[in-house]
Amino acid sequence: MPNYKFIAGDKKWWRQAVVYQIYPRSFADLNGDGIGDLAGIIDRVSYLKLLSIDAVWLSPFYPSELADGGYDVADYRNVDPRIGTLEEFDKLIEELHKVEIRVFVDIVPNHSSDQHEWFQAALKAGRGSPERDRYIFHDGLGENGEIRPSELVSHFGPTGWTRVTEPDGTPGQWYLHLFAPEQPDFNWDNQEVRDDFIKTLRFWSDRGVDGFRIDVAHALTKDFSDGLPARSTMDIDPKLPDGSDPLFDRDEVHEIYREWRKVFNEYDIKGKVEQAKVLFSQDVESTFVEQMLVEGESDIDLQFNIMLGETMQIDPQKTFSAVKARQRGKNKGRSVSYTHLRAHETGRNLVCRLLLE
């Protein structure tokens, strides 16, 4: 384990925290190659301290082909060599902890890069293999499987399915991707997938990371028992009961995060110094957040709301409803954080923070 400094204090420090997001590839370029790097962040630690922030949130720094700004992760337990090394990451944690700034990192569990070793193994292994079961593959429709399995769009394009070439060179199965074709979705019913992400959480926690921001937190678990979904948008089907949409906001996703919480609880009790880990998510769908906050789920510590910024100027009623939903959470004793009226997905003309305590 790297030799880093723990920060003592209140385990609920994040209730009042100011968190500063850093996109490492553009924040500071120390070696002058045109790409931001970890060394550049280390060089700016004194500047970050002057901002009086409590934590930084590092957007993906993992090896990636950058089909989606680094959210297509090729290796979850490494640093992209274009921006640094694991040793430099350890140094960054050490320097930030010296000035009592904690560190959150992005974790991207819904999908990997198509260059991830698991997906490459799935392409080589063929139909029905354990390697393919880590992802979501389906046969196509039509006489030769040439028609995609369902009329499902993705967030980034007209279809959520892409066909692969089988090991023998023939056109083959299709894989699901809710985002870019370079981002195949994991199969979270596969125990190997679940175990490997636990391994990833421990890997970064042992290196001193103080918390994780979950990308696409509401989309991990999927249910195709009633057939593959066909839809023209990526919105939750309003006709379905809460927690039963086949793609998003399913009740089962909280089982995953409760398992993660068990891992983090191990760090809460180690040693005599503060090592508590924080788990937070991006608020996309209100039912996901209301279950977490109002029903008192103990899996995710807090969330930030980008939808607030998207609706504030165009739909005051939706903004009011969003605030009321989180106020119900506040009345149940949970911390509710509204942050990022603008984030990495949106234009950055305004950033603010509002805490309801």
Language-model segments: residues:
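Acidic/aromatic-lined carbohydrate-recognition and catalytic surfaces
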Residues: 2-202, 206, 219-291, 295
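Aromatic- and acid-rich polysaccharide-binding/catalytic face
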Residues: 297-313
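Glycoside hydrolase catalytic-domain groove-lining segments
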Residues: 322-335
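Short, compositionally biased segments
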Residues: 274, 336-338
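Outer-membrane beta-barrel transmembrane domain signature of Gram-negative proteins
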Residues: 310-322
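Hydrophobic residues within beta-strands of alpha/beta enzymes
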Residues: 56, 212-214
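Hydrophobic alpha-helical segments, chiefly the membrane-spanning helices
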Residues: 350-357
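Conserved small/polar residues in nucleotide/adenosyl-binding loops
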Residues: 339-346, 350
